[in-house]
Amino acid sequence: MNMTVDPRRKEKINRYKAPKNQGQSGGANEDMMPDYMNILGMIFSMCGLMMKLKWCAWFALYCSCISFASSRASDDAKQVLSSFMLSVSAVVMSYLQNPAAMTPPWAS
């Protein structure tokens, strides 16, 4: 005589409730590094384009690659892609204007 009785207690079951976000921000656990790298990439690519500094253009490409690699799936893909394309265009335009090799900033 084998009876199958459910051993769980119905009064002890608590349904999971997701924590509410505080205000506009996603909370303290949200990683802001992709956003910071995106902004840095845009700033350095503009410096590379306007001031014709090759090291700024390369650093912008580096920042936008980090931003692309660490972005979440829920992030706006257009913003990340536009930052990446802006940094690539900064590198290309800086070498089209002056095809000489890059000199380090401390050597000039």
UniProtKB/Swiss-Prot annotation:
<dbReference type="GO" id="GO:0044183">
    <property type="term" value="F:protein folding chaperone"/>
</dbReference>
<dbReference type="GO" id="GO:0045048">
    <property type="term" value="P:protein insertion into ER membrane"/>
</dbReference>
<dbReference type="GO" id="GO:0005789">
    <property type="term" value="C:endoplasmic reticulum membrane"/>
</dbReference>
<dbReference type="Pfam" id="PF03669">
    <property type="entry name" value="ASTER"/>
</dbReference>
<keyword id="KW-1133">Transmembrane helix</keyword>
<protein>
    <recommendedName>
        <fullName>Protein Asterix</fullName>
    </recommendedName>
</protein>
<dbReference type="InterPro" id="IPR005351">
    <property type="entry name" value="ASTER"/>
</dbReference>
<feature type="region of interest" description="Disordered">
    <location>
        <begin position="1"/>
        <end position="29"/>
    </location>
</feature>
<feature type="transmembrane region" description="Helical">
    <location>
        <begin position="80"/>
        <end position="96"/>
    </location>
</feature>
<keyword id="KW-0812">Transmembrane</keyword>
<keyword id="KW-0472">Membrane</keyword>
<comment type="similarity">
    <text>Belongs to the Asterix family.</text>
</comment>
